[in-house]
């Protein structure tokens, strides 16, 4: 053998050998092996693994000669395996914390049921009917263990669990996990049904005044012996491990408290019970000490529960004065005593007892309330934020963005409060040097961030600032501030001689120009301009601000005024008036226009008419933004002035097109159809395109109730809009000699551009006029040859069904216009069902099925009091229902499809059955069966689930079909009522899903 080989062999033989893992069946062969194994310092397999192995082997199903799966046999081998599992649990002293952590719910359920069985608890007997006081101690303890585990499992299941990262997919593992998940859910369902009984059992246990005993490995061996070999020791003897009454009550109180606390989320009154149990637990822990064998309670978690209960159920007795800061803060927040919260936070800056995260959560809650419209909380938000910022500074953290935002506009009150918080948060006698340094740096940074020297002086002269900063540091701070922007005056006190320096003319002019920009008082504007013109005659003061804009049709006339002062005054008054009107400051706009009108009346009839026109537009806007929104008709003199404007024939008067638009829209909005159709002068129809359009709209609305043959104006309106949406064609010869066709958008073929038409429509509010326009554009959209899904609209039949020259229409622009119009109309009235249906159809046509369902459901909801009444059949037509069916089908919500098939006038069984056959459904499936009223569909469901072997779902379908109100022999009214009730519930459920 070579030297290398010898070394290798020596190294290999010198390694310690890992003893082989003991197999589960070895414990069957040697009775004493289990105790020896469990006495090892690190037994392999671990005790909990042994429990799993023993119970897994004992519960394995058997296969008979006919290859049929049989339940596990009740033979000696399986009984011994179950006993071994119980003995391992006894070795662990029945510690539920250990067992729950390591065993799954099905395994622990099986283990505790075996404990009940071996403890002679009669199977099938309700624990709540048993008298614990008369039961043998070990039997009573077994019952308590099971019911404690039951409510602990229910509580644990209510907590969110982070899903484990899935490994590589293996079919066998996935099937096993799915089976275990279903089994766990079934057990939890049973435990929740019995939860009330379990709580009663545990409440009864608190009344016991005797010690109990828990099974040990020895008592389990005795129970397993033949009755004649027990040597006189019985189950009621003291052979088990003693559990003192106080220990048992302490553990039960804690578990009951957790159960009550979990129930409090749905019934707040139960929090009182939880509080009582948790505080009793604290008392019992103080009595028995923390070294108890059978009372393992997480005292930190218990303290958290107690604090939460203090907040949720504040005590009314004398202990309320000893509330924790948590409880005090929550009580103050509930009662709106925010000043007390601020005081608690300031005191906490010294004690540092409240976590920073908790303080931040309080600030977030206050911000949320302030954003909801409670403006009084803005000051409170700043004060709480200041307290939190000082806490951050003391602990060496950076200043939050929130504080910087709230301190953007400092004032005396904010700085006073900040200095108060800083002073009360630092104990200068006990504070460390690093803490003092943090506070000093913070105050320096605040000073450097301030521009107003008055505020800088407030901080620099404060006692805390003087104490924390040395003379050299204060001097250095002043030097730093001197190097900043020169616009900041660095003198602590104003220099008296500064006021003796005479201001230059340019400074005075600048100040007056600044006042001129800010002022909206006509008299003050006039005075400023007189002063400015007295100082200099070279400037044109209408150019001072580039924000002063006057329409180009007016500016030529105004700038032609020879007198400079008058020209500036007229221009500025008009510009400011137009700006005020734009920002809806109508009162100032009226003052400015009135002053301008008075001024120009003296020398210019042309400008006088201009101002009258602008004041008319202002009065229209004022009415529309004020009483017009409440539906109050405008005064008759305003209507007369609008008519006068439309009929005006003064030559050389500059006119703004927007005034004509607003006047025509005003007449349409207030249903002045008689005037527009019969009284408008003929020359207006030829010269003003908006009057022409308004006349056609008014006439179409007026003729709408009449027969189709008489609707000539509808055809005229159609032709006008088609012409507007048409494109002009040009021919171009390319380099290769070929002639190509070019479409030029926004052509001049129509009476106005499409963009102008859209702008005009967005000034309308009258529902019928908007419906007519929307209907026209929908029809124009549907005329396309390549359209797949038509959009529906009211009055669509009044329009022509074809266009002679389809190629000339810009259908892309039409589609965009339809979407714009629907968006606008719904902003005017979001509860108009016909407009909602159009919006839904648009989404349907563009394959946005979830959004389409949202609007179909909203259309039904607005006309049925959220489905509490029947949806009118003219809203949910067969076409709408079929589109809803298609949406659900394409969203893979196949059960919803089947239910909607019932809404059709003739139930579509073929589609319903086909959808129910789909197994990959993304909806609630069998939870929807209660909404089916058609017995044929329910019968098909029963057959389908029976065929698939889906017993639970089949039972749900049978339960639904067995309801007496669906009996075919019932009167028609009863059947209709049953159907209507299910329709209502289903549509409300759908609305909650898609809204």
From Swiss-Prot:
Residue windows of the TPR repeats: 250-288, 320-356, 570-603, 833-866
Name of this protein: Integrator complex subunit 8
Comment, domains: The WFEF motif is required for the recruitment of protein phosphatase 2A (PP2A) to transcription pause-release checkpoint.
UniProt keywords, alphabetically: Chromosome, Disease variant, Intellectual disability, Nucleus, Phosphoprotein, Repeat, TPR repeat
Compartments it resides in: Nucleus; Chromosome
Cross-referenced SUPFAM superfamilies: TPR-like
Outcome of swapping residue 298 to G: In NEDCHS; occurs in a splice site resulting in altered splicing and probable nonsense-mediated mRNA decay
Illness: Neurodevelopmental disorder with cerebellar hypoplasia and spasticity: An autosomal recessive neurodevelopmental disorder characterized by global developmental delay, profound intellectual disability, seizures, absent speech, spasticity, facial and limb dysmorphism, and subtle structural brain abnormalities including cerebellar hypoplasia.
UniProt similarity note: Belongs to the Integrator subunit 8 family.
GO terms under biological process: protein localization to chromatin; regulation of transcription elongation by RNA polymerase II; RNA polymerase II transcription initiation surveillance; snRNA 3'-end processing; snRNA processing
Motif WFEF motif: where in chain: 24-29
Subunit organization: Component of the Integrator complex, composed of core subunits INTS1, INTS2, INTS3, INTS4, INTS5, INTS6, INTS7, INTS8, INTS9/RC74, INTS10, INTS11/CPSF3L, INTS12, INTS13, INTS14 and INTS15. The core complex associates with protein phosphatase 2A subunits PPP2CA and PPP2R1A, to form the Integrator-PP2A (INTAC) complex.
GO cellular component, one term: integrator complex
Function: Component of the integrator complex, a multiprotein complex that terminates RNA polymerase II (Pol II) transcription in the promoter-proximal region of genes.
InterPro entries in the cross-refs: Int8, TPR-like_helical_dom_sf
Residue positions where Phosphothreonine is found in the record: 18
